[in-house]
Regions:
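Intrinsically disordered, low-complexity segments enriched in Ser/Pro/Gly/Ala and basic residues
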Residues: 19-21, 68-70, 92, 196
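Residue-level hotspots at or immediately adjacent to binding/recognition sites across diverse folds
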Residues: 76-84, 95-436
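N-terminal secretory signal peptides and thylakoid transit peptides that target proteins
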Residues: 62-84
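N-terminal chloroplast transit peptides
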Residues: 1-66
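Hydrophobic h-region of N-terminal signal peptides that target proteins for export
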Residues: 88-94
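A periodicity- and composition-biased signal for non-globular, repetitive helical segments
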Residues: 23, 29, 80, 85-86
Length: 436
């Protein structure tokens, strides 16, 4: 199961109807029939108006390798100057010459250790993935265009500079990363897509249309070489089979258009809806869950459906996050620290189909739930370093008190296998699973 939770404030945008973009870049209206062709890496105008149908409109992509040389821009010079100043101040004051120490050693957990990262304060970690050919080689993403790389299973991390592929004076946040074998994808906001075919040794930027509805928030490498799915926070789903030269839409309209069209169905909160998804989750069958930014209802989509399907909720409790369980059921995290699990596999019909789990969250909000691939152990994380685990399918939970001293909100928990897992938080906090 793959999930992304969109952090930060999103300004809703009204989308009265879907926009279709051809290779010529003309808006035809009606459906998402979009060919997102390769474009110039340093521009956002990715469509070429003089291209003919059937022609390769993409220009040769700029690549950045592990040893690529580049010029240093103003942003990079300022960052280096700040790092030097902070380090010098630490040495002068007689403290350890470690400019960015996030409290290593304060954690006393039997399950997790905190990893020192070469990051500035304030960076929020957003996603992590390892190459399919080597579980020791992976990448970590975050705000402020953060990309870190590990070759020892996540014990140590080094900064990976991909700024040569990005527009200057634009602060990107990398939302999602996915690998299938040595082929990998990274997406971010403002709209940016990076692609590798050699396990991340070299990356290229692939152009995205400025007409893309919403911001890309989730990317999944789905199959053989060149195949991927991309989702935006407005519910647009695209898939490619030719390494992003062309994209085909899987749905015919945004979630706003669907809800405003189906307002007569009685979906609470659907009338004149102009919001976005706050959480999007995908299971191994290619089915999606999308939680509204208000937390009062959610929508689902399965391959072959033309539209997202609204799911009403009658409960007053707002949902913070939700996703799929290993058995195909649904989990919900409600505001205030509650956990609810659907009683059966598949999609529940009513709120009564959920049962509240026993957890003493102390009122701290829970932000994500993950599990080992075997499904034997569930983990949930949240505010003020809160970590809980369950060994009975999520019915009863125990608190890991060893993380109480972690001074961070923990946003994401992901396991690559039963022995390799990570928790991602704000202020550059990364916890690595070490077992009991």
């Amino acid at each position: 199961m793959t999930m992304v939770t969109i952090r930060g404030t999103t300004t809703p945008r009204a989308t009265p109807r879907a926009v279709s973009v051809s290779r010529r870049g003309a808006a035809r209206g009606g459906r998402f029939v979009v060919d997102l062709a390769r474009g110039r890496p340093r521009t956002r105008a990715m469509m070429h108006g003089d291209a003919r149908d059937g022609e390769d409109v993409g220009e040769r992509a700029v690549t950045v390798g592990e040893n690529a040389s580049r010029s240093v821009g103003r942003r990079e010079l300022a960052k280096r100057a700040m790092a030097f100043a902070v380090t010098a101040a630490a040495v002068t004051s007689g403290e350890r010459a470690k400019a960015f120490d996030f409290g290593s050693g304060s954690i006393e957990s039997s399950f997790w250790e905190q990893i020192d990262l070469p990051l500035e304060p304030g960076v929020i970690l957003l996603d992590i993935a390892f190459t399919g050919e080597n579980s020791q080689h992976g990448f970590l993403l975050g705000t402020r265009q953060t990309v870190l790389e590990t070759r020892d299973g996540g014990k140590t991390w080094d900064e990976r500079d991909l700024s040569g592929l990005l527009d200057e004076d634009v602060n990107y946040r990398f939302n999602s990363i996915s690998f299938k074998g040595d082929e990998g994808w990274i997406i971010g906001k403002p709209a940016v897509l990076l692609h590798t075919t050699d396990g991340g040794a070299n990356w290229e930027r692939v152009g995205l249309s400025p007409r893309l509805p919403g911001a890309p928030v989730l990317i999944t490498a789905t199959g053989d070489n060149g195949q991927a799915e991309m989702v935006t926070d407005e519910g647009a789903i695209y898939f490619t089979k030719d390494a992003a030269r062309n994209w085909k839409a899987a749905v015919e309209e945004t979630v706003s258009a669907t809800l405003n069209r189906t307002v007569s169905s009685g979906i609470t909160g659907a009338s004149y809806y102009t919001g976005t998804f706050s959480t999007i989750a995908r299971n191994d069958k290619g089915e999606y869950l999308g939680l509204s930014s208000r937390g009062n209802f959610y929508m689902t989509w399965a391959p072959g459906q033309a539209y997202w399907q609204p799911r009403n909720r009658t409960s007053a409790r707002r949902v913070q996050s939700m996703g799929w369980r290993p058995d195909g059921g649904i989990w919900e995290l409600t505001r205030g620290g509650g956990i609810y699990l659907s009683n059966d596999t598949g999609l529940p019909e009513e709120d009564s189909d959920f049962t509240e789990a026993r957890i003493g969250s102390r009122g701290f909000g829970l932000l994500d739930l993950g599990f080992t691939p075997s499904g034997k152990t569930f983990w949930t994380v949240g505010g003020s370093g809160s970590v809980f685990y369950s060994t009975d399918g999520g019915k009863k939970w125990k608190r890991d008190r060893g993380t109480d001293n972690v001074a961070a909100n923990l946003y994401t928990v992901k396991f690559q296998n039963d022995r390799q897992g990570f928790v991602l938080g704000n202020d550059g906090v990364l916890l690595r699973y070490i077992g009991k």
